[in-house]
Swiss-Prot record:
Its main location: cytoplasm. It is found in: Cytoplasm. The keyword tRNA-binding applies. TRNA binds at residues 14, 64, 66, 112. Hydrolyzes ribosome-free peptidyl-tRNAs (with 1 or more amino acids incorporated), which drop off the ribosome during protein synthesis, or as a result of ribosome stalling. Catalyzes the release of premature peptidyl moieties from peptidyl-tRNA molecules trapped in stalled 50S ribosomal subunits, and thus maintains levels of free tRNAs and 50S ribosomes. This is Peptidyl-tRNA hydrolase. It holds the Pfam family Pept_tRNA_hydro. The active site is at residue 19. It catalyses: an N-acyl-L-alpha-aminoacyl-tRNA + H2O = an N-acyl-L-amino acid + a tRNA + H(+). Coiled coil: none annotated. It comes from Beijerinckia indica subsp. indica (strain ATCC 9039 / DSM 1715 / NCIMB 8712). CDD domains: PTH (cd00462). InterPro entries: Pept_tRNA_hydro, Pept_tRNA_hydro_CS, Pept_tRNA_hydro_sf.
Length: 198
């Protein structure tokens, strides 16, 4: 089995924030594969699906971003899985909006959600880094990530999250590079790669 974790902050006030694109990706996956309604568990909300013959537990921590590791750790210990079976979907300032990269391990790049998870289960998990771009000034980062996507941005966010969902079986099979390429081509086909997103 695999644990798919989307990072974000709980509550309507944060639901459209750039920082919540991890939640948005998990919700898109749940919709695409007809997942049962999310229920409260592991200090978060969970559901289950099957992809490529693999059981997938979907988790959205409700601990707030900075304590995400508590929720992830609860699930990891309950299912007795290694950190390598965890895939975390999160916003990435260092990638252009709409760009996606998958990596295993590494640093946290200042992301407090990743920092918390690493403290609880080590850094031996895979990350789906979802680009939201950088405001250009370090002092503006907090305001930027906690700001809502604009109406213009919403077009690529919706297309991107759908593409992540459609191609999620590739992640389940460990085909990370193929997953990235499929998403790039989907964005390109939608005409979004021509808007300076990549």
């Amino acid at each position: 089995m695999l644990l798919f974790v989307g990072l974000g902050n709980p509550g309507k006030a944060y639901s459209a924030n750039r920082h919540n694109i991890g939640f948005m990706a998990i919700d898109a996956i749940a919709r695409e594969y007809g997942a049962p309604a999310f229920r409260a568990r592991f200090q978060g909300l969970t559901s289950e699906i099957t992809l490529s013959g693999e059981k997938i537990v979907l988790l959205k921590p409700e601990t707030y971003m900075n304590e995400s590791g508590r929720s992830v750790s609860d699930a990891v210990h309950f299912y007795k899985i290694d950190a390598s079976r965890v895939i975390v979907f999160h916003d990435e300032l260092d990638l252009a909006p709409g760009k996606v990269r998958v990596k295993k391990g590494g640093g946290n790049a200042g992301h407090n959600g990743l920092k918390s998870i690493t403290q609880h289960i080590t850094n031996d998990y895979r990350r789906v880094r979802i680009g939201i771009g950088h405001p250009g000034i370090k002092d503006m980062v907090r305001h930027y990530v906690l700001g809502d996507f604009s109406k213009t941005e919403s077009a690529w966010v919706e297309t991107l999250c759908l593409s992540i969902a459609v191609n999620a079986p590739l992640l389940a099979k460990g085909e990370d590079e193929n997953f990235q390429n499929k998403i790039f081509h989907a964005m390109e086909t939608a005409g979004l790669a021509k808007d300076g997103l990549f």
